[in-house]
A protein has these predicted regions:
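Post-transcriptional modification and biogenesis factors for structured RNAs
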Residues: 1-189
């Protein structure tokens, strides 16, 4: 099982969204205090919809508490300062992928101690960072892709049928089918 770690998250809606993503991906969520909200706040639950009760999560008092309770864990740390691009590393089945708080990321002293396992998402232009929920989803689904989507619930056949029916295509002839095939080829589905 993959593990997502949020170090001192500040925005409840981001954490709720990430919780929902973890449920969908079959990943465990680790939350390291202090957090900028209470875990039972409405904004956390609202962003996680009705999936929060299905989420496997643990809350830790501090970063040292997290390390003590997860000895020997392989931890990748997402930061804009990393040399390694997230898609260039091989994510192990039970690894941990850590993200820092929205306003400051992972503290420099932690990154220095773990330089070899820091990863980044490439960005263009004058952007300082991506939204935390988006960043988690990008890296988590790359790790799942590398592992062959081990807990996937569907082969996509029913989803393709539903998409075709939703567009009123019926037998999927013509341009729509070309677009679907392009999309699937582009995203390697």
């Amino acid at each position: 099982m993959l593990n997502i770690v949020l170090l001192e998250p500040e925005i409840p809606a981001n954490t709720g969204n990430i919780g929902r993503t973890c449920v969908a991906a079959g990943a465990k969520l680790h939350l390291i205090e202090p957090m900028g909200f209470q875990i039972n706040e409405k904004q956390v639950k609202r962003a996680g919809l009705d999936y929060w009760d299905k989420l496997d999560y643990t809350i830790y008092d501090s970063y040292p508490d997290f390390l003590e309770k997860n000895p020997g864990a392989k931890i990748y740390m997402a930061t804009t300062k990393a040399k390694h691009i997230y898609s260039d590393v091989s994510f192990e089945e039970d690894c941990y992928i850590m993200f820092g708080k929205e306003s400051a990321g992972i503290p420099e002293e932690i990154l220095v101690e773990n330089e070899e396992t820091t990863i980044r998402i490439p960005m263009y232009g004058e952007i300082r960072s991506l939204n935390l929920g988006n960043s988690v989803a990008i890296v988590l689904y790359e790790a799942l892709r590398q592992q062959g989507f081990p807990k996937s619930q569907s082969d996509g056949a029913s989803s393709s049928f539903s998409l075709a029916r939703w567009h009123g295509i019926g037998n999927c002839k013509g341009n729509f089918l070309k677009k679907v095939l392009f999309f699937c080829n582009f995203f390697k589905c």
